[in-house]
């Protein structure tokens, strides 16, 4: 209430601030504004208006018409210029001379150019319209001569300007040619200032309300929309403004992509609320609550009772039910039983289930490869000679696209690497090489099945074995082709043309992509590319490439990924259902996709967006022998990290091999060179004390400074091989401040709290952007390591590089050069390097506006997930909502050394706390579709006869509901199945009895992670056939059915046509006969 009293409304012309030479602060966005929403390929290809960036903050001066006070205001103003009149809500913080804008301004065009200042405003407006200064002066003199400025206003400005051109052309044709005049007119007409003024004349409601309702879409709407779109919005604002609150309606009726006004934005427009009925207002409130809950908790649905009870302060239960029915009628939500879904989330989970089921129902593509050969090659052994017998059954794959890079395939052992040309170390036999049986099973499953999910911690070899399998396939094909060429060359009748033709494809011709490696983030894709020495893309890049191909209308040129037969998705826990649905559908419809391989760790944090794709698919497919866990760690230097990750997954306190106490005089361990898991203990604090927050910041700063300056801590000599991770953003800010002073010697912010960037800084992008959007305008300084000075004949290659190279959200760069160019305009140029082969010089202002860079010595756990580093430092901070999965995910980011900075009590609290289970239905949808489609459960003929796979494959029924162990309470295995859903072990220091009692009533017990870490029997519980199931199904054959009689036949009945009945000895039958 006090805050409302301090709010003030200003109304007046928008004047520039007298000392406004500052740069727009585009990097300092609020936390909720940083999320860049994924756009589906169908929406991209629709030609609709997409969201842009928020306008940067700037200071302006507003002479208030109410009080006549000249107010300095700081906020986001998408349009600037004294010809605009604005209405804005402001708040003045204590000890501040500037008002802070709350929300966004409403714009009104001063049609009469604000007499008596028409001449000045007209001059400034034409200058903003890119008209030359001398031309402006000529026009102003002409206006004074033929008329007066009192008669000049925006409604007749364009006609007056065109009349000026015609008269000057008649008077003196030597001054300018008609073509030059047309060019000037075109520049004015195409300028953003002119377009926005004309839109304001024609659609005043659009200018008044859209800056608040659609802040990201506003500038793009008025600059690129047709009069039809703007007219639709103008009409809706005057009659049915509630429609603008639902993205499905704005897309369906106005072709606006992911565009909707929030309930908070509507609340700032009381005149629009007056046009809504109570039913429409309640629908907007419910929709806002549903979307907020799904975004914050990761759910794809909410139970009706939970949703309505959370809205009891806003509406009655009857009103909530009426509003939900209204939302269903307009196709915004979907009901299923007592569940309410957002339509797009329901469709995403349904479409994923349908696509996976379709893949598993297609004729299988079996890879006849000796997987032991493949695994032996990773360990440096000599495999059997891969002859032509090891080919692909059916149609042979074409060339598998590969781009050789500087990196080498990351082998499982630290010092063992695989040569990219397919050669292997000799003097070893396969039988002498100890193979990981989990990896054997995993590769045989991939070869035999259409869909495979592999889960395991970092270092278990998921990425290595998959990439090695397809490199092996590529090598087999190359060997076969080379042998065929040699045989043909030895043929005496071979033509000279064949012998003289080059064996290599021309430069610049891309190979067909058959194995598509993908990851959810740019950093994860970069790591995948570095480990496998194969091309890797983000899922968004695959999605966007289809859009680019569609918009170019190149019918004769196929889509880049139209030849894909295998899709590999790494870091599956980070993949949201929305983007996975889009990419999977694209490849199923527009490529030759035959195999899907998902890699990840089901124990890690799920995606930030709603859904729990990896875990849901894993749990569904494990009973069909298509989901495998790799348990063995192959990184010898990180065994303690893996062991502690196991303990944390059981919610047990980790074991440290070194400890550093932070107090007045920090005590250093004797030697830390050979330690891998180190506890940096902070002093315990009294949370009830008022000075607790200050003590925590002081202790954390001391701990970070001790690590950075300690002589024994060689891991921090370079920030390129170490990374700080924290749960809270405020802890990241403090660590970045300390690291910035240590590594580069400057502060991260100036006195106005603006970020400072300099040479040596470690930065990261928080939004995706293409390199072509970041280059300097003249492109003279944009000489990157990736392309350099391109000659004229290579201009297209250079252009393709710039348009295809993407700076991804989460990607880390180092600033290597900082230059300010003053030749034309004051332009700041930064040279940034990602330490993976890309170094480019970009325009600093464009980098800030498009990528919104931040310092990156410290990152939050959610933004660093999917990446890894040699040394990782995790700051627990105050536990709060933090639980064991946060700690688990953080420590598994470290390859060779992990530090944990925490109070022991906070660390214990975080590791003991259970996660928050996500409410999703993908598992249910997938089970239902697989059982209904009778898709083959697995390629048993190609599976190994390992007891771990177990069972009698020929007699096991496909996808029987009796095999769903968590729901089958009739078997003894089911009782043990409940145990596997509880991550705590018997030795855990947690009150498991109390928690178990709380969770017995829920299907998704505990964290929902599907198996105990080191219990193979629990992991593959359903693989061994149940005695009750096998005893029934083993003897069932369609050709051995015996006709049974339901009733005793009479004399005139044909006994040969009796129906199927129960056994004659069944008591029910005896009763019926009586």
UniProtKB/Swiss-Prot annotation:
Q: State the top-level EC class.
A: hydrolase
For this chain the motif Nuclear export signal maps to 1022-1046
**Major localisation:** nucleus
PTM comment: the record says: Phosphorylated at Ser-942 by CDK2 during the G1/S transition, resulting in its nuclear export into the cytoplasm. As S phase progresses, its exclusion from the nucleus promotes the activation of long-range resection.
Which function does this protein serve? 5'-3' DNA helicase involved in DNA damage response by acting as an inhibitor of DNA end resection. Recruitment to single-stranded DNA (ssDNA) following DNA damage leads to inhibit the nucleases catalyzing resection, such as EXO1, BLM and DNA2, possibly via the 5'-3' ssDNA translocase activity of HELB. As cells approach S phase, DNA end resection is promoted by the nuclear export of HELB following phosphorylation. Acts independently of TP53BP1. Unwinds duplex DNA with 5'-3' polarity. Has single-strand DNA-dependent ATPase and DNA helicase activities. Prefers ATP and dATP as substrates.
This chain's protein is named: DNA helicase B
Q: Looking at the keywords, is RNA-binding present?
A: no
Note one Pfam family from the annotation: AAA_30
Q: Name one GO cellular component term.
A: nuclear body
């Amino acid at each position: 209430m006090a805050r409302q009293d301090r709010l003030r409304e200003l109304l007046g012309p928008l004047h520039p601030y007298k000392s406004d030479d500052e740069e727009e602060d585009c990097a300092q966005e609020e936390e909720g504004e940083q999320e860049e929403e994924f756009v589906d390929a169908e929406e991209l290809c629709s030609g609709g208006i997409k969201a842009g960036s928020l306008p940067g903050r700037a200071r302006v001066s507003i002479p208030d018409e109410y009080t006549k006070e000249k107010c300095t205001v700081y906020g986001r103003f998408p349009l600037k210029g004294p010809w605009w009149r604005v209405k804005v809500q402001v708040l003045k913080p204590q000890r501040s001379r500037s008002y802070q804008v709350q929300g966004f301004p409403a714009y009104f065009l001063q049609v009469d150019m604000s007499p008596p200042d028409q001449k000045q405003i007209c001059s400034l407006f034409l200058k903003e319209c890119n008209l030359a200064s001398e031309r402006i002066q000529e026009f102003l003199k002409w206006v004074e001569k033929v008329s007066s400025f009192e008669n000049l206003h925006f409604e007749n400005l364009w006609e007056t300007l065109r009349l000026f051109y015609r008269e000057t052309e008649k008077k003196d044709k030597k001054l300018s040619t008609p073509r030059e005049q047309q060019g000037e007119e075109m520049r004015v007409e195409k300028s953003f200032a002119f377009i926005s003024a004309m839109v304001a004349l024609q659609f005043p409601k659009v200018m008044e309300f859209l800056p608040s309702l659609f802040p990201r879409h506003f500038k793009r709407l008025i600059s690129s929309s047709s009069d039809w779109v703007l007219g639709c919005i103008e009409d809706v604002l005057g009659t049915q403004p509630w429609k603008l609150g639902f993205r499905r309606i704005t897309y369906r009726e106005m072709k606006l992509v992911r565009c909707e006004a929030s309930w908070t934005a509507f609340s700032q427009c009381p005149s629009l609320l007056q046009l809504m009925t109570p039913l429409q207002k309640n629908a907007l409130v419910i929709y806002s609550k549903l979307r907020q809950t799904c975004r914050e908790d990761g759910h794809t649905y909410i139970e009706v009772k939970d949703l309505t009870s959370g809205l009891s302060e806003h509406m009655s239960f009857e009103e909530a039910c009426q509003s939900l029915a209204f939302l269903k009628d307009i196709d915004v939500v979907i009901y299923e039983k007592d569940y309410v879904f957002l339509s797009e989330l329901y469709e995403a989970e349904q479409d994923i289930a349908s696509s996976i089921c379709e893949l598993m129902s297609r004729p299988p593509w079996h890879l006849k490869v000796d997987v032991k050969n493949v695994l032996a090659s990773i360990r440096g052994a000599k495999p059997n000679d891969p002859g032509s017998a090891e080919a692909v059954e059916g149609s042979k794959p074409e060339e598998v696209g590969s781009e050789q890079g500087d990196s080498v395939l990351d082998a499982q052992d630290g010092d063992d690497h695989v040569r990219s040309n397919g050669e292997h170390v000799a003097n070893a036999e396969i039988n002498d090489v100890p193979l990981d049986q989990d990896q054997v099973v995993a590769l045989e499953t991939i070869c035999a099945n259409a869909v495979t999910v592999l889960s395991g911690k970092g270092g278990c070899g998921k990425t290595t074995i998959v990439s090695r399998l397809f490199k092996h396939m590529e090598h087999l094909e190359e060997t076969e082709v080379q042998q065929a060429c040699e045989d043909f060359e030895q043929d005496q009748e071979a033509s000279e043309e064949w012998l003289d033709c080059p064996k290599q494809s021309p430069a610049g011709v891309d190979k067909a992509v058959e194995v598509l490696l993908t990851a959810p983030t740019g950093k994860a894709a970069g790591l995948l590319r570095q480990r496998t020495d194969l091309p890797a893309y983000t899922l968004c890049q695959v999605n966007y490439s289809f859009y680019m191909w569609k918009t170019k209308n190149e019918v004769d040129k196929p889509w880049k990924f139209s030849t894909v037969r295998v899709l590999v998705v790494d870091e599956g826990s980070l993949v949201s259902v929305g983007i996975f649905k889009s990419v999977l559908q694209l490849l199923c419809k527009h490529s030759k996709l035959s195999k899907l391989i998902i890699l990840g760790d089901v124990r890690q944090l799920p995606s930030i967006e709603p859904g729990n794709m990896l875990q849901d698919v894993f749990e569904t497919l494990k009973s069909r022998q298509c989901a495998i866990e790799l348990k063995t760690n192959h990184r010898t230097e990180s065994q303690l990290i893996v062991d502690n990750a196991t303990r944390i997954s059981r919610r047990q306190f980790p074991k440290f091999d070194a400890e550093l106490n932070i107090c007045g005089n920090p005590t250093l361990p004797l030697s830390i060179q050979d330690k891998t898991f180190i506890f940096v203990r902070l002093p315990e604090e009294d949370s009830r004390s008022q000075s607790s927050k200050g003590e925590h910041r002081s202790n954390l700063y001391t701990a970070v400074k001790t690590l950075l300056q300690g002589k024994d801590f060689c891991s921090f000599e370079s920030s390129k091989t170490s990374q700080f991770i924290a749960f809270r953003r405020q802890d990241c800010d403090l660590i970045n401040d300390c690291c910035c002073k240590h590594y580069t010697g400057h502060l991260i912010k100036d006195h106005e709290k603006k970020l400072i960037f300099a040479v040596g800084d470690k930065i990261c992008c928080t939004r995706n952007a293409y390199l072509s959007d970041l280059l300097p305008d003249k492109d003279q300084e944009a000489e990157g390591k990736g392309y350099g000075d391109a000659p004229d004949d290579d201009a297209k290659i250079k252009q393709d590089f710039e348009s295809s190279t993407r700076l991804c959200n989460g990607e880390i760069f180092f600033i290597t050069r900082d230059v300010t160019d003053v030749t034309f305009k004051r332009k700041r140029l930064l040279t940034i390097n990602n330490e993976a082969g890309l170094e480019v010089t970009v325009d600093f202002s464009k980098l800030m506006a498009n990528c919104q860079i931040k310092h990156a010595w410290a990152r939050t756990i959610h933004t660093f997930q999917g990446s890894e580093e040699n040394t990782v430092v995790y700051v627990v901070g105050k536990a709060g909502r933090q639980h064991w999965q946060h700690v688990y995910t953080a420590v598994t980011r470290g390859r060779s050394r992990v530090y944990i900075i925490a109070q022991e009590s906070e660390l214990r609290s975080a590791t003991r706390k259970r996660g928050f289970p996500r409410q999703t239905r993908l598992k249910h949808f997938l089970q239902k579709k697989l059982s209904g489609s009778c898709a083959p459960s697995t390629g048993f003929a190609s599976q190994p006869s390992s007891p771990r796979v177990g069972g009698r494959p020929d007699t096991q029924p496909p996808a029987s509901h009796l095999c769903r162990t968590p729901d089958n309470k009739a078997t003894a295995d089911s009782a043990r199945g409940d145990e596997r859903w509880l991550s705590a072990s018997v030795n855990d220091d947690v009150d498991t009895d109390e928690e178990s009692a709380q969770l017995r009533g829920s299907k998704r017990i505990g964290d929902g992670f599907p198996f105990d870490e080191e219990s193979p029997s629990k992991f593959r519980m359903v693989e061994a056939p149940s005695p009750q199931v096998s005893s029934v199904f083993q003897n069932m054959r369609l050709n051995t059915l015996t006709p049974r009689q339901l009733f005793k036949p009479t004399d005139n009945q044909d006994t040969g046509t009796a129906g199927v009945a129960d056994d004659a000895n069944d008591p029910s039958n005896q009763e019926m006969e009586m």
